Amino acid sequence: MRKTKHIIRDIIGYCYYNTMKRFQNIGNRCLIYHAFGTRLKHDSYGISININKFKDQMKFLNDHYKMTDINDFSSDDVTISISIDDGYKDTNDAINILNNYNIPFTLFITAGKINQKGYLSETDIYNISQIKNSIIGTHGMSHNRFEKMNYSSQFKELKDSKLILQNIIKEEINITSYPHGSFDKNTTGILSKLGYKWAACSKKGFNSFSTDNFLLCRSEIIASDTIIDLTNKIKGYYDYY
């Protein structure tokens, strides 16, 4: 059944790409990763990827694309940026690989999980922030959905996470990603009030100078993705869903 679903997905993706996306493939494609070997509860989707597979993917990307920051739209060609959500402890393993290839990355950290078992420590986060190609951003306090919160709860999540991380890295933080890709009409106004300049969501697509700063598109990479799947996601085969 799973194989059949993949075949159907790929057929639809091929048709979508060739009719809608082939001539729109300019800009930055940001990829989302989460965990790198950690066994996560209820991970039926496969967001925890084998670290060796991640290494192979980074080598492939570095060999075939220009790698840039998530908010760098200066190239006239397709560029790739890497983002990592949540802040699991095994993020350190992924960052060692990114650093070896000199690949820029953005790390979005759930501030309420810092120092907990299985998550990055304050020392980890500070050390990561000192890497030349790193950007540190917030990912809420609790990893709950913003669209399920009232205004004051959202404000507190975005403010507290910002202050906690700024205190750790001793630098201004102006970027966030929405937990579960969830936000509502209040969220962007709160971001502006708190001094955020960028926010990443879960909408798929290319980013450019015309992209809303608070709706940066990202495409999720999961454990079952092959290099072909990775390439197709970059091209936009699956942007239709």
State each model region's role.
Residues 1-35, 40-41, 45, 217-241:
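Membrane-proximal basic amphipathic "stem/tether" segments
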Residues 11, 86-87, 140:
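Generic detector of well-ordered alpha-helical packing
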Residues 27, 39, 45-48, 53, ...:
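Active-site beta->alpha N-cap acidic-glycine motif
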Residues 31-38, 79-80, 99-187, 212-220:
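Metal-dependent polysaccharide deacetylase catalytic core of the NodB/CE4 family, i.e.
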Residues 46-77, 166, 192-213, 224:
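C-terminal domain-boundary segment and adjacent tail
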Residues 54, 91, 154, 158:
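Aromatic/hydrophobic pocket-lining residues that form the small-molecule binding cavity
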Residues 90-93, 184-188:
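Short, well-ordered alpha-helical microsegments
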Residues 93-94, 147, 226:
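Short, function-defining helix-loop hinge/capping sites that tune catalysis or transport
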